[in-house]
Amino acid sequence: MAMESEVQPKVHIVLLNWNSFGETSVCLTSLKDLRYDNRVVIVVDNGSTDDSVARIKAEFPWVEVILAGKNLGFPCGCNIGMRRALEDGADYVWLLNNDATADPGALEAMVAKAESDPRLGAIGSAIYEMEEPSKLQAWGGGYVNFWMGHARHYLAPIPDQKVDYITGASFLIPRAAMESVGLLDEGIFLYWDDPEYCWRLKRAGWKIGVAGDSKIWHKGMTAYGKKSPRMDTFFNASAARFFREYSPIPMISVWVGVTLRMGKRLLMGDFDRARAVWAGATQKNSVPAPGRVMSMNSNRPTIKSDPQVEPKIESENHFERSAGGRR
């Protein structure tokens, strides 16, 4: 049974779009059927060069669209939506990948899980393969192996205390947690932002959990074809940043992981991707790691820091939501 709307916490759902109206529209269509009334949907457009924005505004007028102005990457784009949600009084922010679809009870189950324990700082879903709807892609998230320098999703139900991170494909964050540790790490462009945030939460005393009744269908990596050297660069730059901050054995974590990933690509004869692994792992980053700031300074980080560009809100019905969304 759904919560009574007058007692439902307010949830802002944040999606990113970048030249992908087809996927975004399928995701938004699934959100119309959520059994949760007190919700607001925000789409942050990360500098699309196609007609995505115009089509989203035309076909989904109940969605608030924010223009980032350029492709800022996943964490920066999400942070724009998260800041807007916090300004609008959100009790929770649900980060949802635009290539995912939600079961009608997905959000209700996540909020129920969150409300059951005030120390939960991140709540995930049971995520299934879009191409094989009965196949589990991740039980909320997964675990990190510091000795091997990698992370792996759990492919079966597992107790919450064994889950190291919640995958960003479906990630519910309470307002109190954001006020405690801040937003996503803007020194990351893509990949590893979800383990980083969960480790930061745990360092600050928060727990993470999985709402098994919250079902999400998400495209697997196989649906996108072969990865590119550019993706390898992003992945390994982000992995190195994570391990240098959170691993008890950072040099081992970084270089064992790099060696294994480079070796795999060399055995495949993919020398461009092998070079990209090295380039990413040795890339310098001038943005301080949030974990480092938290470990050195007990003051809470701001949740309203300026994004890299001034976002533009594109919503003609800024205060008029869908029938399911209320201010």
Predicted regions and their residues:
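Acidic/His-rich active-site region of diverse nucleotide-sugar glycosyltransferases
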Residues: 76-80, 100-182, 187
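Non-catalytic, C-terminal membrane-associated alpha-helical segments of glycosyltransferases
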Residues: 229-240, 244-327
